[in-house]
Amino acid sequence: MQITAKMVKDLRESTGAGMMDCKKALVEANGDMEQAIKVLHEKGLGKAAKKADRLASEGLVCVLVNSDFSKATISEINSETDFVAKNDKFINFVNNTTKHIQDSNITNVEALNNSLINGEKFSDFITNQIATIGENLVVRRFNTINANGGVLNGYLHSNSRVGVIISATCENVDRKKAADFIYQLCMHAAAMKPSVISYKEFNPDFLKSELTALKAELEKENEELKRLGKPLNHIPEFASRAQISDEIIEKEKEKIRAELKKEGKPEKIWDKIIPGKLERFLADNTLLDQRLTLLGQFFVMDDKKTIEQVIDEKSKEFGGKITITNYIRYEVGEGLEKKSEDFAAEVAAQIG
């Protein structure tokens, strides 16, 4: 039977396979479209199995927030190359998979693989996608947050490589206003990469080692600043608010009072001076919080205030207390070792 260009085109559109693969399948199937699809499927499965061994470190992040800001899902799905990550078929696969995860309340990869999507087992569905798209695809991680009576929102950066979701309890606060504010916090987190919400999540051993590293870093910088004749960095006693007890705060207040007395400042104005000096002490001794905690970072839209201060201001403005309860940030390829090959070796490998 003669294989026409239209037959090849129809088979390609229905399967997404390459043009030459479609032509060969039609020849093998003697022009039978259904048999040709079966041939491609069988060959595709073989190709997909080989592709599944290849490292997938590119891809996309997807953020899906429902209409009333009560539920959000974030996912990272990897491909082998940035080229495929921009492919419409891959983008649709990522969006459909994330929606399936949210709609089906799926919490882990095993449950995802065993679930049904469009009447097909997901493990078979992704294998077919690998065969069609032509690269190994991996659902690396995903998470769904329920606001549990609070409000949440999410942000996906324009390149779809960084996504954030944040939830909060919002007492007597208009949901839309709260959601809009949380969106701004998500944008901040996308840019500034906080690791945790608060210093309260830090481990004491971690803080101890980070303080040592921080001091060494600042002392090294001071060597260069001294050489240039510039003001030196303050070497902190502490790295985080977690290390500063109420007793330490009180001792610092006493130290400030003694300094003010020595300077001859009238005692009646001490109460106006002490808060500012204490704030400076805390700023100098919480550098780790400013780098790694969402609440301790300075807001990208107003770098004179920390996120915690901005939240306090918004709580007063909205007439109800806002408390951050969950924060998740994904960036494509975080922690993955990217495979590096020279171009000649890559071409040789593809030729076989």
UniProtKB/Swiss-Prot annotation:
Location(s), subcellular: Cytoplasm
Chain spans, region Involved in Mg(2+) ion dislocation from EF-Tu: 81-84
Keyword hit for Oxidoreductase: no
A Pfam family reported for this protein in Swiss-Prot or TrEMBL: EF_TS
Any Gene Ontology CC annotation: cytoplasm
KW Electron transport (keyword) present: no
GO molecular function, one term: translation elongation factor activity
HAMAP family (alphabetical): EF_Ts
Record family assignment: Belongs to the EF-Ts family.
Protein name: Elongation factor Ts
Biological source species: Campylobacter hominis (strain ATCC BAA-381 / DSM 21671 / CCUG 45161 / LMG 19568 / NCTC 13146 / CH001A)
